[in-house]
């Protein structure tokens, strides 16, 4: 009888568990440190700043009510993305909407079946730290209706091997059905032993502020195959059990263990995952507790389990191919060469403008694509000699029937203003070192001096012979045959359709597509592959520092009237110093496209380069121009890369002024000068130099030239006499400069980056984090202003072609700093096609 009575009492015991009713879906085996996705909107808001593009996810959590000890079941939708970055701080935003359907009879207090709306925000603080705030709002009736709670999140990615995540849950505690909600503190540490997502190990814990209940967990993730991850997790959870019976209520603390196994698969932009969770309950029996299912669409997913289909890439060359744009193009072409899914590349020419070395660099990268056994096709509507130079690297060249090919040769223009100055009574007075430094001749002479003319002719011969031999070889012509073809140009598409020496076909775009597919032997989609998440958080960093335009004192700026950039010495020096002092940057590439300019600014840049040499690799990649002060800046680099058509050298200096006294006299203006000091007005533009002053000026130029020569000698491992012999203002093409030891190797930016990889002991295919300097300084107000401004259709006087060309004929560094000693190319080089 006693036994039966005891059994009867046991049968009416109602067991419940005191759990925090504000939790969302359980989402087992989802980390709060390391890699983050849209689920971070509810799990650790700080992780949103580490996302790469938008993502949308749907999750469903199922549990067996018979064995459930907590909430966390239901359906959830999550959306998140990172924003900004670059000139603006990187942030992350996330949304979550969860329909919670917990085992109500198992929980105390009864949470009902609420909807939980989450809005989260994260701010990146530097590259390795992020802070987040999550806002939760409950609705749909029940004890949680209208409740608002907040979470604080922290995420740290120290490096490729270690990450940390932390949460403060329910910052603003409230009562739910008379039961206070306690704050909870979560911490998780994650280790990647191999530095990649091949293997992840993590451990974490959670403690309640009021009851002191402690949960602990561990997690392992292994990349079984590309696009397939196996996940395992074990968790020990503290439970507060409440037993209600006719004899009254009792409560006590107990524990349970949960084990989760999961499989995550990337199918490209779509990902799916499934997890199953087993439980060893407080009664020490084992049960299958439940399962979780996840589907998501991501802009930057992991590489797919199913290989990306073969495709064709389309590369458009249009607009101004300035240095930063060129970086994107050549890096992309190198990536295409290494991508096994690319079957071919179609290069579309649409009015691109760039110097010959720029075009030569792009052409070299197209040849690298061909060397990787991929077809290259060129298509143009109305091509120029510049376009054709690049297009000649292609396997097939196609021309639109409505267009033509303006193949007429190469021309350059130099301006000489002496006649105009004589007419108005202006006397240019300049001193220079040495005899090839012909920059002042545009002011002092009516035409080139014989030595300058010879130098110009030799330079043009070098450039033209390179164009001629390169294109002739590509089109299986002799240079003489190609010269005759050029001399008979330009050509219409109709003329070229009858003669396939220059093009392989004249066809409309749809017909060209058919021809390309025939050449490839199949039909392939055109377009770049989707972005893929990297297998590591950090990549070796290399700083790319641009010296773009005339070198001037102070900060970098631009002259929009003539469309010229000025490389401020102070800006470049600060960039080099910042890159040198940044411990995360392994090497520096100085990317130069400059004719020189201010002697002082050029030397300050060179000094900073020498200060960096030996601290970390510092390499130079010359683009179209790296002459005079531009060469001074490069002299201290460990290795100098240039294209054969780069224009460099011009090791020399000049200084002077314009005597306006004749003009002033013609205008009937009288000038009275007061001075204390014999040479107080020596730089005045209202009188000429005395003979004594010109001698003193030349002595100062000799001193500066000596410093220039000494720097080149030190940097290039040459004697000063050897540098002087190839200096004295002489301008060279890269092809001429290499035998003179002014250039080490032919190549472009990618070749310099390969050298950086070598010096950092990295594989040649290692992905790099390119840090571009100087940072583009645009204020938020300026960005908003550009978005809201409507351009007015007006053409200022300075935009008239004739006026613009005349103004461009004057070196920009002289326009800005007429009173500074100049280390600059002898002319404004404009090479027509």
What is each PLM-predicted segment?
Residues 8-90, 172:
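N-terminal, post-signal peptide beta-strand-biased segments of exported outer-membrane/organellar beta-barrel
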Residues 300-415, 538-663:
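Cleft-lining beta-strand/loop regions that shape enzyme active-site pockets
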Residues 44, 58, 75-83, 119-123, ...:
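Residues on the lipid-exposed face of transmembrane beta-strands in outer-membrane beta-barrel proteins
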């Amino acid at each position: 009888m006693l036994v039966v009575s005891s059994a009867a009492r046991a049968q009416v015991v109602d067991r419940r568990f005191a759990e925090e009713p504000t939790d969302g879906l359980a989402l087992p085996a989802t980390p709060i440190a390391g890699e983050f996705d849209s689920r971070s909107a509810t799990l650790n808001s700080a992780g949103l700043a580490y996302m790469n593009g938008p993502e949308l996810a749907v999750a469903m959590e199922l549990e067996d009510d018979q064995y459930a000890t907590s909430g966390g079941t239901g359906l959830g939708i999550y959306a998140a993305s990172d924003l900004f970055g670059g000139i603006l701080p990187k942030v992350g935003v996330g949304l979550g909407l969860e329909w919670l359907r917990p085992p109500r009879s198992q929980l105390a207090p009864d949470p009902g079946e609420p909807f939980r709306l989450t809005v989260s925000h994260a701010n990146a603080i530097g590259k390795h730290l992020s802070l987040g705030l999550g806002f939760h709002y409950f609705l749909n009736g029940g004890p949680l209706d209208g409740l608002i709670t907040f979470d604080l999140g922290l995420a740290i990615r120290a490096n490729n091997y270690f990450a940390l995540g932390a949460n403060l849950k329910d910052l603003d505690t409230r009562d739910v059905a008379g039961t206070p909600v306690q704050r909870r503190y979560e911490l998780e540490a994650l280790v990647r032993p191999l530095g990649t997502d091949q293997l992840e190990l993590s451990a974490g814990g959670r403690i309640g502020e009021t009851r002191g209940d402690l949960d602990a967990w561990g997690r392992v993730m292994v990349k079984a195959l590309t696009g397939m991850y196996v996940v395992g997790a074990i968790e020990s959870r503290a439970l507060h059990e409440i037993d209600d019976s006719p004899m009254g209520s009792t409560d006590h603390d107990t524990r349970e263990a949960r084990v989760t196994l999961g499989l995550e698969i990337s199918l490209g932009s779509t990902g799916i995952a499934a997890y199953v969770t087993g439980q060893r309950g407080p009664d020490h029996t084992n049960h299958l507790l439940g399962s979780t299912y996840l589907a998501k669409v991501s802009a930057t997913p992991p590489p797919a389990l199913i290989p990306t289909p073969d495709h064709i890439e389309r590369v458009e060359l249009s607009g101004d191919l300035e240095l930063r744009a060129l970086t994107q193009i050549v890096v992309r072409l190198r990536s295409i060469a290494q991508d096994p899914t690319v079957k071919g590349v179609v290069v579309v020419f649409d009015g691109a403008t760039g110097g010959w070395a720029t075009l030569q660099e792009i052409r070299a990268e197209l040849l690298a694509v061909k060397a990787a056994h991929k077809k290259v096709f060129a298509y143009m509507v109305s091509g120029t000699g510049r376009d054709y130079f690049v297009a000649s690297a292609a396997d097939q060249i196609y021309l639109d029937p409505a267009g033509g090919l303006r193949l007429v040769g190469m021309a350059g223009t130099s301006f000489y203003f002496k006649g105009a100055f004589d007419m108005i009574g202006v006397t240019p007075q300049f001193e220079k070192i040495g005899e090839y430094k012909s920059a002042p001749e545009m002011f002092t002479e009516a035409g080139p001096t014989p030595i300058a003319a010879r130098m110009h002719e030799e330079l043009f011969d070098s450039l033209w012979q390179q164009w001629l031999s390169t294109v002739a070889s590509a089109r299986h012509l002799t240079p003489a045959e190609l010269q005759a073809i050029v001399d008979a140009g330009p050509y219409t598409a109709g003329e070229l359709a009858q003669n396939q020496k220059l093009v392989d076909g004249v066809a409309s775009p749809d017909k060209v597509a058919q021809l390309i597919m025939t050449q490839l032997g199949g039909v392939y989609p055109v377009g770049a592959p989707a972005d893929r998440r990297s297998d590591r958080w950090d990549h070796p960093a290399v700083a790319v520092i641009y010296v773009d335009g005339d070198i001037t004192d102070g900060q970098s700026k631009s002259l929009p009237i003539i469309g010229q950039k000025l490389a401020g010495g102070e800006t470049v020096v600060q960039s080099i110093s910042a890159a040198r002092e940044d411990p995360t940057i392994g090497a520096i590439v100085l990317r130069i496209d400059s004719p020189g300019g201010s002697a002082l600014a050029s030397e300050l840049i060179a000094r900073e380069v020498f200060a960096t040499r030996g601290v970390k690799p510092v390499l130079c990649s010359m683009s179209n121009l790296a002459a005079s002060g531009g060469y001074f800046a490069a002299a201290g680099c460990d290795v100098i890369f240039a294209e054969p058509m780069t224009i460099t050298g011009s090791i020399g200096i000049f200084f002077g002024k314009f005597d306006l006294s004749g003009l002033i006299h013609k205008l009937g203006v009288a000038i009275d000068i007061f001075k204390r000091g014999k040479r107080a007005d020596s730089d005045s533009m209202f009188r000429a130099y005395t003979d004594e002053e010109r001698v003193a000026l030349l002595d100062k130029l000799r001193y500066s030239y000596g410093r220039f020569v000494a720097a080149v000698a030190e940097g290039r491992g040459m004697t000063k006499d050897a540098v002087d012999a190839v200096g004295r203002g002489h301008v060279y093409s890269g092809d001429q400069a290499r035998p003179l030891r002014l250039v080490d190797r032919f190549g472009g930016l990618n070749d310099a980056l390969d050298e950086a990889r070598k010096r950092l002991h990295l594989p040649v295919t290692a992905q790099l984090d390119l840090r571009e300097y100087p940072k583009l300084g645009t204020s938020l107000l300026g960005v908003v202003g550009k978005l809201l401004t409507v351009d007015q259709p007006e053409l200022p006087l300075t935009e008239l072609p004739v006026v613009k060309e005349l103004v461009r004929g004057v070196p920009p560094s002289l326009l800005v700093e007429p009173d500074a000693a100049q280390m600059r190319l002898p002319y404004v080089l404009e090479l027509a096609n």
